[in-house]
Amino acid sequence: MLKLLLGDPNARKLKRYQPIVTDINILEEDIALLSDDQLRSKTADFRQQFENVVSFAKQRALLDELLPEAFAVVREAAKRVLGMRHFDVQLIGGMVLHEGQIGEMKTGEGKTLVATLPSYLNALTGRGVHVVTVNDYLARRDAEWMGQVHRFLGLSVGLIQQDMSPAERRRNYACDITYATNSELGFDYLRDNMATDLSEVVQREFQYCVIDEVDSILIDEARTPLIISGQVERPQEKYQQAADVAAALERAAEQGKDGIDPEGDYEVDEKQRSCTLTDEGFAKAEQNLRVRDLFDPADPWAHYITNALKAKELFVRDVNYIVRDGEAVIVDEFTGRVMPGRRWSDGQHQAIEAKEQLAIQPETQTLASITYQNFFLLYPRLAGMTGTAKTEEVEFEKTYKLETSVIPTNQPRARADWVDQVYKTESAKWRAVANETAEIHKQGRPVLVGTTSVEKSELLSSLLSEQEIPHNLLNAKPENVEREAEIVAQAGRAGAVTIATNMAGRGTDIILGGNSDYMARLKLREVLLPRLVRPEEGHRPPVPLQRAAETGGGFAAKAAASNGSHGHVLSEARAIGSLYPCSLTDDTDQFLAELARELVKVWGDRALSVIELEDRISTAAEKAPTDDAQIAALRESIARVKTEYDVVVTQEEVRVREAGGLHVIGTERHESRRVDNQLRGRAGRQGDLGSTRFFLSLEDNLLRIFGGERVASLMNAFRVEEDMPIESGMLTRSLEGAQKKVETYYYDIRKQVFEYDEVMNNQRRAVYAERRRVLEGRGLKKQVIGYGERTMDDIVEAYVNPDLPPEEWDLGQLVSKVQQFVYLLEDLKPEQLQGLSMEELKSFLQEQLRNAYDIKEGQIEQQRPGLMREAERFFILQQIDTLWREHLQAMDALRESVGLRGYGQKDPLIEYKNEGYDMFLEMMANMRRNVIYSMFMFQPAASGQEQA
């Protein structure tokens, strides 16, 4: 009703952009008249305007002002370089992204092209722009493909890949626009904040970020934090000795009261899940271990004994854990399921292994961690695009403060979504899928089948092989992943059948009739690879499924036979056949052979790596100007091959359209409606014809867990045959309800992860900011003296009670504590402090500390000028890193323990916040004290070598 009265809010929002679109369209004519050089010089003109604008707010205002002209420039560059012109709706998409929102754009509407607009505009500030994708392949593809537009306009384009060295990373992050995956960005951020020298830092300050497939990164991946951990070298035999000591100690029958120890060696508090040694227990343990002090820092035992006691009393075999195959496996207390691979932290798991006489595995310790939620919130402006965001609108708004706008499609949608078919058993469902695939394949239409697991995709593959239907398999198996792009590029050809597991198939569009541009590049690769690439790489070049030219289009049936019963890897024999739509003319074959000979002369005989060859072919496939004669020759040959292929591909495209376009089959409902919509969105791109259908069975997970019995009893009542499908509105509605339930459940988990990490995040930012200041070496001396002054204040506050008269203050104790930290003040006498007020005491001691520090600096600088600054930096970083690591563990332990406080009517999150804050203040105070102590104790070796 409200919608009728007020109109669609999304439409109202988009209306705002219309006048700007008109401005860009008016500018288009003038900009089209510019030469390439004049168009390129626009970038320098824009950049000049930012020279004296420093503040973020002013830069943003200037960007908004430049937007119409900058967008018009990018549109013209894309026309010249890629032969693609941004539609009006894509300009609106660009504006939505520039404003830091999420744009929902349907599959095939050119999301990747849209991203060029805001990334060019925001790169003009010189602060750098990050474009984030879900995997390395897509990052590389986009950097090569869309990067052409930016390079043509004079911007530098960087790419981050998994195996890059720090120097390469730094160079790529320094570019105007950098393409990377979410995990590479996150891990680089964590590594930068563990660097011990500024030269190791690879990233710049964050400015603007566009995330492709934003739902996948900010929602699906949000539950798992990024963690860098290191193995901790701890003596294994200590665990065993501690377990033996714990076994010999006796538990107290009751807990001590009013500070008086009970009878026995240790007491157990089951509520707090803790064990504490009594004085008697300490003596016994020290005697058994033949040590003088369990807390001796040189040989600490207390931690091991406490863990051994907890393993003995609080961790019960077959309740908290089971022993299986020589390992202690945790049992989840909520579900009762075992959790292989999971381990208790902080040495507790090792204590249990010692108790059970199992092999003790090394401890790991978290060195740094962050969630994607908090990582991406570090960007002052964040934007994202996806085909499906509306179902998660609330979460984007609440967690990330991101609005969602639905961008209209350029052409009206012509896809038909057929009704779901539900079968009684899974085997009946798979037979039905194979039959429908065969039926549609015979009509000459391409079919894409989405499966949920590798196992299921191979089951369907064998069913299709029985019917002799040639098909392509695309799942997480390594041999198939390599060919992902090639397979998807061919999935739109007449009669093509592609089985894809849901991990796959993002990023490459399915073009009806096939992608002639891609086939031409593949042909070139096939011709050049044996001549130019080093054979010892052991890299079997992926070559897509072949077709026989004489069939004039449809896949050759012989392909099925060699696919084997499970459609695994293509046989080597067929791998160099002809996947291509037609054979090339003799002239072109001759031309390619000649090209290969020429390239061998210049680039060497089999001297390149596969990646280098691919990069050169990709560069040749661009339209950007080049002075390189070899790249120009490659470009000419790609164009020549493409022209020949186009003749067949265009005819095939017409045939496929007439037959009804791509048909997409879903074989199971996913936990999230969003993933189902992504699969459907593969058909009917850009107004193409197409159809989709989901096949389900009562044995599918979602139906089984949420209300399958009710439906099963209905089917039994109606005596439905196994092979008879049900099409029912009630069923579809209850499925959607089930999906909503699952989505809400996962949202709550993510929300909780976020709320707890939010507490850590504020602490993380403070620690990392302090660390960065030290790395950059800004005012180190002032910082250390500041630490010292605060330490003096802490000592005064600890030893002086303002409520007592000054003559009762224990100044002797206070002075000896100060001398512990600053041995240079050994002449300080308690008498010098008499008669001073508390504030005067603080000022006097701070003054003494500053003088002592100057003396220390004089001594150290005599050894080698600059050594004092190096020492300051070393000690601060060492202390921050050590204490932060310990703090991370303590916060983990706190998080586990606060959960129980819900029983005491306390909010665990508030308890976590308050205690976490106190622990953080304590950590920072320890860091200051340790640094001051280390600086005064620092004695460089005579050679001038630093001894840490």
From Swiss-Prot:
Source domain of life: Bacteria
Keywords: ATP-binding, Cell inner membrane, Cell membrane, Cytoplasm, Membrane, Nucleotide-binding, Protein transport, Thylakoid, Translocase, Translocation, Transport
Keyword Nucleotide-binding: yes
GO biological process entries: intracellular protein transmembrane transport; protein import; protein targeting; protein transport by the Sec complex
Bilayer topology term: Peripheral membrane protein
EC number: 7.4.2.8
Catalysed reactions listed for this entry: ATP + H2O + cellular proteinSide 1 = ADP + phosphate + cellular proteinSide 2
Database matches in InterPro entries: Helicase_ATP-bd, P-loop_NTPase, SecA, SecA_CS, SecA_DEAD, SecA_motor_DEAD, SecA_preprotein_X-link_dom, SecA_SF2_C
GO cellular component: cell envelope Sec protein transport complex; cytosol; plasma membrane-derived thylakoid membrane
Residues that span the membrane, as ranges: none
Keyword Transmembrane helix annotated: no
GO MF annotation: an example: protein-exporting ATPase activity
Enzyme class at the top of the EC tree: translocase
Location in the cell: Cell inner membrane; Cellular thylakoid membrane; Cytoplasm
Major location category of this protein: membrane
Positions bound to ATP: Q90, G108, E109, G110, K111, T112, D509
Pfam family, one: P-loop_SecA
Assembly and binders: Monomer and homodimer. Part of the essential Sec protein translocation apparatus which comprises SecA, SecYEG and auxiliary proteins SecDF. Other proteins may also be involved.
Family named by the database record: Belongs to the SecA family.
PANTHER family: CHLOROPLAST PROTEIN-TRANSPORTING ATPASE (PTHR30612:SF0), SECA INNER MEMBRANE COMPONENT OF SEC PROTEIN SECRETION SYSTEM (PTHR30612)
Known role: Part of the Sec protein translocase complex. Interacts with the SecYEG preprotein conducting channel. Has a central role in coupling the hydrolysis of ATP to the transfer of proteins into and across the cell membrane, serving as an ATP-driven molecular motor driving the stepwise translocation of polypeptide chains across the membrane. Probably participates in protein translocation into and across both the cytoplasmic and thylakoid membranes in cyanobacterial cells.
Protein name (database record): Protein translocase subunit SecA
Species: Prochlorococcus marinus (strain MIT 9313)
